[in-house]
Amino acid sequence: MTKTLPKDFIFGGATAAYQAEGATHTDGKGPVAWDKYLEDNYWYTAEPASDFYNRYPVDLKLAEEYGVNGIRISIAWSRIFPTGYGQVNAKGVEFYHNLFAECHKRHVEPFVTLHHFDTPEALHSNGDFLNRENIEHFVDYAAFCFEEFPEVNYWTTFNEIGPIGDGQYLVGKFPPGIQYDLAKVFQSHHNMMVSHARAVKLYKEKGYKGEIGVVHALPTKYPLDPENPADVRAAELEDIIHNKFILDATYLGRYSAETMEGVNHILLVNGGSLDLREEDFTALEAAKDLNDFLGINYYMSDWMEAFDGETEIIHNGKGEKGSSKYQIKGVGRRVAPDYVPRTDWDWIIYPQGLYDQIMRVKKDYPNYKKIYITENGLGYKDEFVDNTVYDDGRIDYVKQHLEVLSDAIADGANVKGYFIWSLMDVFSWSNGYEKRYGLFYVDFETQERYPKKSAHWYKKVAETQIID
């Protein structure tokens, strides 16, 4: 049976400032930690990325032409405050006013994120969100943006608090490149959630007309053997690290006893302690019912088995299938069942995980209000022929995920939109330019855009709401 989506459903495309804009030092923009980190550690940089800084009118015209009625955009904090606070960069402010005006002109609703992996270097080198001073700087930055950009109707505080902590302090593929420090992972998550809560409360107290929420990456975790209590425990602990800790902070305003038992076990095995203060929980409690929406970024699920050896994580950055490894002492090891397909980057394709995660939020956090799927898509080594890409694999991937959204809505979940990652091809943090996700192919040499087969398919779905 052909499935459908609601008439008012948003069919969006997602971008991020650092991955799309280029112009990393243009018009007064301050440095971010990624600038030097990429130069020192990788074979690529974020120059010029997709040159969105100059070519956004082209991308928004394409969005309008192809039925994309929402766009995720992030503001580069260091374009507004080059050092993270203090002096405002007028040219950066002007750029975003112009960008948002173009969105509205093209009838593409901007969903605007304040922080998408790109803390200004001056604050990042001072501890990033492990340093509580930077909570204050973030709230001040948020307050400035809320007041300066009344044309924005949908705000997101952070994109993927979980992967920021993981990338910086667990996997070590984000600056500062620290590995296996789980105390820092949890502390980063916590301090960013406090920052989120304070920004949300401020937004509501000021009476702004728009909506505000947060975007969490929520990869669903399953036990490899559901009959084996040790595998079940491994999946629960892995879920606490990546999902439950931040969801509790968002919607409970505290960490449940079950969550803290898991956190304490992980820290007992791996070392470290947390600084959780009374005023933090006052802030979390005050904001728990103020979130207008939850953004869920979903790409994959993981299966866990019990594991007691030493921690080792190997990141597959070049698309060499089977080269990744993930095992955490006292938590578990990721082992995918044979029956689930995976991408060249070892990302497991499992749409059921998106359905299960949505229904989990609905059940465990009934104060969630509504959900947008703020990122979902397939990273591919696209083959450019005949001025297009015949990306049937991407179409199939998105179709399967839209179908489970239709199921979730039918089963009572309030899901209001879907943003494909990504609108056009962009630069990928730890994979460079080989891994493409866009509806529109970008020739990074010429910066020309070409609609892929998926763009034509997505347009039809957006126009008819029929998933075919």
UniProtKB/Swiss-Prot annotation:
Quote the Pfam families the UniProt record gives. Answer: Glyco_hydro_1
Under the cellular component aspect of Gene Ontology, which terms does the record hold? cytosol
Q: Which reaction does it catalyse?
A: a 6-phospho-beta-D-galactoside + H2O = D-galactose 6-phosphate + an alcohol
InterPro entries in alphabetical order: 6P-beta-galactosidase (IPR005928), Glyco_hydro_1 (IPR001360), Glyco_hydro_1_AS (IPR018120), Glyco_hydro_1_N_CS (IPR033132), Glycoside_hydrolase_SF (IPR017853)
Molecular function GO terms recorded? 6-phospho-beta-galactosidase activity; beta-glucosidase activity
Ordered alphabetically, the record's keywords are:
Glycosidase, Hydrolase
Does the keyword Hydrolase belong to this entry?
A: yes
The similarity annotation says: Belongs to the glycosyl hydrolase 1 family.
According to UniProt, the name of this protein is 6-phospho-beta-galactosidase 2
Q: Which organism is it from?
A: Streptococcus pneumoniae serotype 4 (strain ATCC BAA-334 / TIGR4)
Name the gene that codes for it: lacG2
